[in-house]
């Protein structure tokens, strides 16, 4: 029984179920980019602004055939996928910021849940939020 518990803890601690580790798709020119800005919310958590260039958010196409530089965003906090994002603003509740240093990451995803890449590297933006 102890062996089983250790395996379960390892699986959950590596976050095996948080995203689709499937296919990667090279982007086409003009190459998309993503940058993040985060601001403390006056009530709870943080407001995230996602600055996108050359990328179309298309929630109506998710699950359909891939199109160049079109899809959705995946939002991760501390390695855990917390949402699909379909706009440039997103509110993240404080409960996700439980560490002293919290890693926020956004990736560009295809309609069929793959990750867009440039020269084999996932197109993403990462920032660290420090809890005081």
Predicted features by range, described:
Residues 46-50, 98-111:
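Short, well-structured beta-strand segments within conserved domains
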Residues 75-80:
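Short strand-turn-strand beta-turns centered on an Asx-Gly dipeptide
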Residues 51-65:
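Short amphipathic, basic-aromatic surface patches that mediate peripheral association
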Residues 19-41:
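Short, compositionally biased P/S/T/A/G/V-rich stretches that sit at domain boundaries
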Residues 83, 109-118:
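Short acidic/polar inter-strand loop motif in beta-rich domains
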Residues 40-54:
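Contiguous beta-strand segments within globular domains
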Residues 13-15:
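N-terminal signal peptide c-region/cleavage motif recognized by signal peptidases
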Residues 81-87:
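Short beta-strand segments within Ig-like beta-sandwich modules, predominantly Fibronectin type-III
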């Amino acid at each position: 029984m102890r062996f089983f518990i250790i395996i379960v803890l390892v699986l959950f601690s590596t976050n095996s179920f948080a995203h689709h580790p499937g296919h990667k798709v090279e982007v086409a020119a003009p190459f998309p980019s993503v940058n993040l800005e985060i601001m403390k919310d006056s009530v709870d958590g943080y407001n995230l602004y996602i600055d996108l260039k050359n990328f179309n958010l298309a929630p109506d196409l998710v699950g359909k055939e891939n199109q160049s530089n079109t899809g959705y965003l995946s939002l991760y906090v501390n390695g855990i996928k917390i949402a699909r994002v379909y706009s440039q603003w997103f509110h993240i509740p404080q409960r996700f910021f439980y560490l002293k240093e919290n890693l926020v990451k956004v990736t560009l995803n295809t309609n069929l849940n793959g990750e867009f890449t440039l020269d084999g590297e996932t197109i993403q933006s990462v920032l660290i939020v420090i809890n005081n």
